[in-house]
Swiss-Prot record:
<dbReference type="InterPro" id="IPR050166">
    <property type="entry name" value="ABC_transporter_ATP-bind"/>
</dbReference>
<dbReference type="GO" id="GO:0005524">
    <property type="term" value="F:ATP binding"/>
</dbReference>
<feature type="domain" description="ABC transporter">
    <location>
        <begin position="40"/>
        <end position="263"/>
    </location>
</feature>
<keyword id="KW-0997">Cell inner membrane</keyword>
<keyword id="KW-0067">ATP-binding</keyword>
<keyword id="KW-0813">Transport</keyword>
<dbReference type="InterPro" id="IPR003593">
    <property type="entry name" value="AAA+_ATPase"/>
</dbReference>
<keyword id="KW-0472">Membrane</keyword>
<dbReference type="InterPro" id="IPR003439">
    <property type="entry name" value="ABC_transporter-like_ATP-bd"/>
</dbReference>
<protein>
    <recommendedName>
        <fullName>Aliphatic sulfonates import ATP-binding protein SsuB</fullName>
        <ecNumber>7.6.2.14</ecNumber>
    </recommendedName>
</protein>
<keyword id="KW-1278">Translocase</keyword>
<comment type="function">
    <text>Part of the ABC transporter complex SsuABC involved in aliphatic sulfonates import. Responsible for energy coupling to the transport system.</text>
</comment>
<dbReference type="InterPro" id="IPR017871">
    <property type="entry name" value="ABC_transporter-like_CS"/>
</dbReference>
<keyword id="KW-0547">Nucleotide-binding</keyword>
<dbReference type="GO" id="GO:0016887">
    <property type="term" value="F:ATP hydrolysis activity"/>
</dbReference>
<dbReference type="Pfam" id="PF00005">
    <property type="entry name" value="ABC_tran"/>
</dbReference>
<keyword id="KW-1003">Cell membrane</keyword>
Amino acid sequence: MTMEALQFLLAAPPGAYDPVARTIEDEPRPSQPPTSALALDIRGLRKSFGDNDVLRGIDLHIPAGQFVTIVGRSGCGKSTLLRLIAGLETPTAGHIVFGEDKLPGDVRVMFQEPRLLPWARVLANVEVGLGTERNSPDARARADAALIEVGLDDKRGEWPAVLSGGQKQRVALARALVSRPRVLAFDEPLGALDALTRIAMQRLLEQVWQAQGFTAILVTHDVAEAVALADRVLVIEDGRIAKDLPIDLPRPRQRGSAELAALEGEILRDLLKGAEDTFEL
């Protein structure tokens, strides 16, 4: 794709050249109420692996329903923080308290790799996200509703092998959404996608977040993605929060706008300064 074509797409109204958005608008919406999101309070959070202190004392409050993005250089601790929030790791010190009693399935994670079962069709892969409720009478209807939300209900009977990379990630998103999580954590889920598919997926993530109302926490290396999606951007440096920047811009946001570019520049300057301090450039 030429730079001119990409700029044309970025300047277009949301959905104008977005096959995902068009599919979702054309399909009937599942008649499900918004999710009751969870707030998070993180106090004195530390994580070490042997002698390596990855997180060095994180204090953070995330209100229910907020969309938070986390950026930082490789090895700064951002993915470790996400895994601690998701309960995939145990902290060395400190604690994470959710706003209400958290139940199994309230927190879900979507990774960069879709991790689909190759021997199961799309609908069955989505049903996996229901966990112990997979055998409930409404399991198939709930999985169908999740596929409609991501614009893939016409692929319910396909095998994962025939899907594109973007379609596989949309199935993974449906699998995460099907249990109606109250917190959804994203660990660089769009990192392996091409530019156009990535933009379409960013818009889809924003749409399902607005529709379901869960608390969203996204780890990404892409500063433009972080600013476009977030209510708030956290910069992690050397295991600590180096910057906590609110993004007070109306939605939907215009990619390539001067306001977004200014915020991206501010965050990039902080990241580059941290790199210079670390490597003494």
